[in-house]
Swiss-Prot record:
The lineage of its organism: Bacteria, Pseudomonadati, Pseudomonadota, Gammaproteobacteria, Pseudomonadales. Keywords: DNA-binding, Repressor, Transcription, Transcription regulation. It holds the Pfam family TetR_N. It comes from the Bacteria. This is HTH-type transcriptional regulator BetI. Gene3D superfamilies: Tetracycline Repressor, domain 2 (1.10.357.10). Pathway: Amine and polyamine biosynthesis; betaine biosynthesis via choline pathway [regulation]. InterPro entries: BetI_C (IPR039538), DNA-bd_HTH_TetR-type_CS (IPR023772), Homeodomain-like_sf (IPR009057), HTH-type_TetR-like_transc_reg (IPR050109), HTH_TetR (IPR001647), Tet_transcr_reg_TetR-rel_C_sf (IPR036271), Tscrpt_rep_BetI (IPR017757). Repressor involved in the biosynthesis of the osmoprotectant glycine betaine. It represses transcription of the choline transporter BetT and the genes of BetAB involved in the synthesis of glycine betaine. Residues 8-68 form the HTH tetR-type domain. GO terms for molecular function: DNA-binding transcription factor activity; transcription cis-regulatory region binding. One of its GO terms (biological process) is glycine betaine biosynthetic process from choline.
Length: 197
């Protein structure tokens, strides 16, 4: 009989083991057996909680996405300035938060992006994540720019955030958060300077 209250603990253990496994050997070689061994559980526990490896990968991605959402939300709650610039800054900061730019998270995101092109459920998660970023950026740009310009600025900043993140992930060096934020802020300020009086 399973212990009461163990499900959230086990699920988190398995998600953390998945991040570690992908960091160590990549998504393709991150087998159920390896993940279970890293988590200190039997292979059957993964099937019990997640059905299969794809279910575990989807849960791991939801975990990373929720960490991103939570980071942005916490930063927004701490804002004393309600300007579009301040809100855009916290979105940028959240996307370059340590929870998103550490080695295991970056390797998992990269593997997820590649895999999502071939798995409909993962592709759906990627589209949700992409749309959320675009929508949040557009909402803030829309406060000061006409809609067509706000959409274009949001698309550009989303692409820049993803591009900076991707370049950092592939560089092999520690992610330079300050530099990435500085570049994104410059683009943001350039777009905000176009505001209609």
């Amino acid at each position: 009989m399973p212990k009461v209250g163990m499900q959230p603990i086990r699920r988190q253990q398995l998600i953390e083991a998945t991040l570690t496994a992908i960091d160590q050997v990549g998504m393709g070689d991150a087998s159920i057996a390896l993940i279970a061994r890293l988590a200190g559980v039997s292979n059957g526990i993964i099937s019990h909680y997640f059905k299969d490896k794809n279910g575990l990968i989807a849960a791991t991605m939801r975990y990373l996405m929720n960490a991103l959402i939570d980071n942005v939300h916490e930063r927004r709650l701490a804002l004393t300035d309600d300007s579009p610039r301040a809100h855009l800054q916290v979105i940028i900061e959240g996307n370059f938060d340590a929870s998103q730019v550490n080695g295991p998270a970056m390797k998992t995101w990269l593997a997820f992006w590649a895999t999502s092109m071939h798995h409909p459920s993962l592709h759906r998660l990627q589209r949700i994540n992409d749309q959320r970023l675009y929508s949040n950026l557009c909402c803030q740009f829309r406060r000061v720019l006409p809609l067509p310009h706000a959409r274009k600025a949001a698309r550009g900043l989303a692409a820049l955030i993803d591009g900076l993140w991707l370049r950092g992930a592939l560089s092999g060096d520690a992610f330079d958060t300050a530099q990435a934020q500085r570049i994104a802020y410059e683009y943001m300020d350039f777009q905000l300077a176009k505001q209609v009086s």
